[in-house]
């Protein structure tokens, strides 16, 4: 698959009320989903979780999340949110499969819904911002900040893995190139991945590379801007490159068929000398 199939520019998947609407059918895979809903002041949006678990993550602004399940009834979480994805870490809400959800925002805002098809029905929960592990990964021009709000070892989900990355302007991240497209116990996980991008400042841009790990595999070299997404069904991915003077944000959403929810990656053999700066 090529850049045309896997690079989704801003608006390419818009499906009111969603500015971004990427599900398994649109992506051509089985597990991972991402939606971004934009609410006007006083606006609200209702949806049903179906056979997926979801995390409601404020990108800009705060909201109230009401969650109703047949087994536990209704609960409500107040998400303080944030001014922008570049400002700080946000709190979030976990939505179990089969739930009914209402998101409402007095001041308006933008909210990501990261999802994964799943089997277990876990309880609805609130994720406080102070409890999100923040990792300073890499060094020099490969330094970046990783917000592990729903990584495999920081927050319990059935299948969903999601993190945020801030790459300073002029730096590389998602580097060295790595992959997670095979099930090799103890060495590599099989995970579909969505990159959703925002760039700080007007006219900012970045670049994303994905190249094949097998014949006919994913092959992308894309200029990305705010609101763009890149799909990684397979293949080596990285680097993600931020334009000098413009910090780059991306939200990674991952899920796969493995019985164990884990993030295990394999580095490209041509770049093994740089893996020490990755984690």
Regions found by a protein language model. Name each.
Residues 97, 105, 113-117, 150, ...:
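Short, structured patches in soluble enzyme cores that scaffold and shape functional sites
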Residues 198, 203-279:
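Acidic/histidine-enriched, beta-strand-rich ligand/metal-binding domains
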Residues 26, 33-104:
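Extended, compositionally biased flexible segments
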Residues 34-38, 92-94, 113, 162-166, ...:
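Conserved hydrophobic/aromatic beta-strand scaffold that supports enzyme active sites
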Residues 12-46, 53, 143-194:
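A short glycine-rich, His/Asp/Glu-containing loop-to-beta-strand
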Residues 50-77, 95, 169, 181-229, ...:
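Glycine- and acidic-residue-biased ligand/ion/polar-headgroup-sensing regions
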Residues 84, 109-151, 244, 251-279:
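Double-stranded beta-helix
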Residues 86-106, 116, 223-244:
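Conserved metal-binding segment of the jelly-roll/cupin
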């Amino acid at each position: 698959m090529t850049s045309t199939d896997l690079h989704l520019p801003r608006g390419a998947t818009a499906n009111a009320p969603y500015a971004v609407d990427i599900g398994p059918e649109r992506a051509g895979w089985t597990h991972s989903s991402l939606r971004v809903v934009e609410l006007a002041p006083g606006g609200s949006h209702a949806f049903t979780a179906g056979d997926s678990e979801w995390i409601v993550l404020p990108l800009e602004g705060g909201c109230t999340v009401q969650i109703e399940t047949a087994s536990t009834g209704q609960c409500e979480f107040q998400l303080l949110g944030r001014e922008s994805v570049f400002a700080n870490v946000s709190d979030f809400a976990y939505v179990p499969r089969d739930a009914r959800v209402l998101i409402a925002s007095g001041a308006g805002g933008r909210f990501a819904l990261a999802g994964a098809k799943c089997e277990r029905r876990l309880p609805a929960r609130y994720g406080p911002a102070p409890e999100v592990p923040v990792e300073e990964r890499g060094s020099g021009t490969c330094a970046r900040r990783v917000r592990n709000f729903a990584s495999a070892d920081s927050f319990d989900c059935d299948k969903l893995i999601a993190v945020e990355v801030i790459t300073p302007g002029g730096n590389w991240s998602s580097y060295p190139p790595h992959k997670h497209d095979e099930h090799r116990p103890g060495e590599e996980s099989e995970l579909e991945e969505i990159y959703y991008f925002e760039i700080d400042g007007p006219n900012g841009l970045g670049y994303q590379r994905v190249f094949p790990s097998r014949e006919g595999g994913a092959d992308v070299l894309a200029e990305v801007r705010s609101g763009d997404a890149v799909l990684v069904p397979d293949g080596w991915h990285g680097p993600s490159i931020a334009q000098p003077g413009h910090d780059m944000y991306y939200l990674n959403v991952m899920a796969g068929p493995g019985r164990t929810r884990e993030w295990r990656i394999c580095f490209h053999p041509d770049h093994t000398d740089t893996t020490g700066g990755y984690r």
